[in-house]
From Swiss-Prot:
It comes from the Bacteria. It is an enzyme of class 7 (translocase). GO terms for cellular component: plasma membrane; proton-transporting ATP synthase complex. Its EC number is 7.1.2.2. Produces ATP from ADP in the presence of a proton gradient across the membrane. The alpha chain is a regulatory subunit. It comes from Streptococcus pneumoniae (strain Hungary19A-6). F-type ATPases have 2 components, CF(1) - the catalytic core - and CF(0) - the membrane proton channel. CF(1) has five subunits: alpha(3), beta(3), gamma(1), delta(1), epsilon(1). CF(0) has three main subunits: a(1), b(2) and c(9-12). The alpha and beta chains form an alternating ring which encloses part of the gamma chain. CF(1) is attached to CF(0) by a central stalk formed by the gamma and epsilon chains, while a peripheral stalk is formed by the delta and b chains. Coiled coil: none annotated. This is ATP synthase subunit alpha.
Length: 501
């Protein structure tokens, strides 16, 4: 039988082409140190910064320090059963979290795993936790207002969609309450809200979730929680996971409000990780890149251009101060990154002025462009009036005689302070804010006793709802004030019917 060399050659070539190796090549290393949520591994020579690494017990880690001899890894989850000598594998993937509509209404951890006991979250979309912020030409200036429902904020320090507004103050001054009230006010405003709780007690987070559920706000809110009992790596990751979820909606042309409660605890967690990873400490033992920790997070909040869908992420980061010291390291860092700050004063809170917003230290660098026309008209001089009232009030403590003009300013100032007070979880629609502030700035409240202002406001809003809903509708639809004569007549009618004259 003749052997056909060409046939044999063709068969061998075909076999080679069809050959599919069934082995998997992965780079592995050995754990050389484990403790306090940190591991060191030898042998992962090609690991990338931020790469996900897989431990023998199924836990995941994230490469942070790439050194000549080993890799410093933060462990995402339980590290108690990881031992020195265990094998660790590269995955070739960067840390990602699940994103999409199916997360709305759920409470998740920073890895996107549900913690609310309502079953699995079914989504096939993921986004990397670290992503570049939109560039200069991909952004648009902030022009649409984000209504918080709080008179003191919407009138004095307005927030726009796409802005970063820092909320700063001591503990127990009402920071979280402002955030929750703002989320409640986004009902029917076509906004998706993300509340990121960092290093809080689980009981506190539970209370906030129940409040959101009670007022129907969980229907458009995602809660990301890394409680105080969880390892530092999860506290460090939580804000990045939250903003990755927000970016998914922003690039679909939607508007998102994200609250970071609070970034002081994230900075402390990052300091702990950095010291354990043997990075050189700087001021207050924070690592040198603690500014970049927050800047790369907050720069991802933006109003993007129409080519990218015209969506926005509005960020409300929180910083907790010690004894009102806003010149501390982390506080000054975040003040310089954000587009303004709302400072909550301890003294104001204890004096019963709530929300305890210190108008003198608070500022919005977006300002009037984030207000509707009607609000601009009624609140234009409110800030200066309030500041001059505080100054005059300090002088009156000396007990000197006052002229009529000064007395009138003091009287108006006291009524302004009362009008800007607001009960918790009762955000006010912007049209109602405009009517009461109009009455205040046009002198209709000057004869009302200060102690009766709260009751006056309740009856005032009830009167407008019942007798003049068309005025509220005009403000809501046109975003402008109706004719002054119309408003004056309606307020005079209310005063004539009421017992406040």
């Amino acid at each position: 039988m003749a052997i056909n060399a060409q046939e044999i050659s063709a068969l061998i070539k075909q076999q080679i082409e069809n050959f599919k190796p069934n082995f998997d090549v992965t780079e592995t290393g050995v754990v050389t140190y484990i403790g306090d949520g940190i591991a060191r591994a030898h042998g992962l020579e090609n690991a990338m910064s931020g790469e996900l690494l897989n431990f023998e017990n199924g836990s995941y880690g994230m490469a942070q320090n790439l050194e000549s001899t080993d890799v410093g890894i933060i462990i995402l989850g339980d590290f108690t059963d990881i031992r020195e000598g265990d094998t660790i594998r590269r995955t070739g993937k960067i840390m990602e979290v699940p994103v999409g509509e199916s997360l709305i209404g759920r409470v998740v951890d920073p890895l996107g795993r549900p913690v609310d006991g309502l079953g699995e979250i079914h989504t096939d979309k993921t986004r990397p936790v670290e992503a570049p912020a939109p560039g200069v030409m991909q952004r648009k200036s902030v022009s649409e207002p984000l209504q918080t429902g709080l008179k003191a904020i919407d009138a004095l320090v307005p927030i726009g969609r796409g802005q970063r507004e820092l909320i700063i103050g001591d503990r127990q001054t009402g920071k979280t309450t402002i955030a929750i009230d703002t989320i409640l006010n986004q009902k029917d405003q076509d906004m998706i809200c993300i509340y990121v709780a960092i290093g809080q007690k689980e009981s506190t987070v539970r209370t906030q979730v129940e409040t959101l559920r009670q007022y129907g706000a969980l229907d458009y809110t995602i809660v990301v929680t890394a409680s105080a009992s969880q390892p530092s790596p999860l506290l460090f990751l939580a804000p990045y996971a939250g903003v990755a979820m927000a970016e998914e909606f922003m690039y679909q042309g939607k508007h998102v409000l994200i609250v970071y409660d609070d970034l002081s605890k994230q900075a402390v967690a990052y300091r702990e990780l950095s010291l354990l990873l043997r990075r050189p400490p700087g001021r207050e033992a924070f690592p040198g890149d603690v500014f970049y920790l927050h800047s790369r997070l907050l720069e991802r909040s933006a109003k993007v251009s129409d080519e990218l869908g015209g969506g926005s992420i509005t960020a409300l980061p929180f910083i907790e101060t010690q004894a009102g010291d806003i010149s501390a390291y982390i506080a000054t860092n975040v003040i310089s990154i954000t587009d303004g700050q709302i400072f909550l004063g301890d003294g104001l809170f204890n004096a019963g002025i709530r929300p305890a917003i210190d108008a003198g230290s608070s500022v919005s660098r977006v300002g009037g462009s984030a207000q509707i026309k009607a609000m601009k008209k009624v609140a234009g001089t409110l800030r200066i009036d309030l500041a001059s009232y505080r100054e005059l009030e300090a002088f009156t403590k000396f007990g000197s005689d006052l002229d009529a003009a000064t007395q009138a300013k003091l009287n108006r100032g006291r009524r302004t302070v009362e009008v800007l007070k607001q009960p918790v979880h009762k955000p006010l629609p912007v049209e109602k804010q405009v009517t009461i502030l109009y009455a205040l700035t046009h002198g209709f409240l000057d004869t009302v006793p200060v102690d009766d202002i709260v009751r006056f406001e309740e009856e005032f809003h009830a009167f407008f709802d019942a007798q003049h809903p068309e005025i509220l509708e005009t403000i809501r639809d046109t975003k402008d004030l109706p004719e002054e004569a119309v408003l004056d007549a309606a307020i005079t009618e209310f005063l004539n019917q009421s017992s406040f004259q």
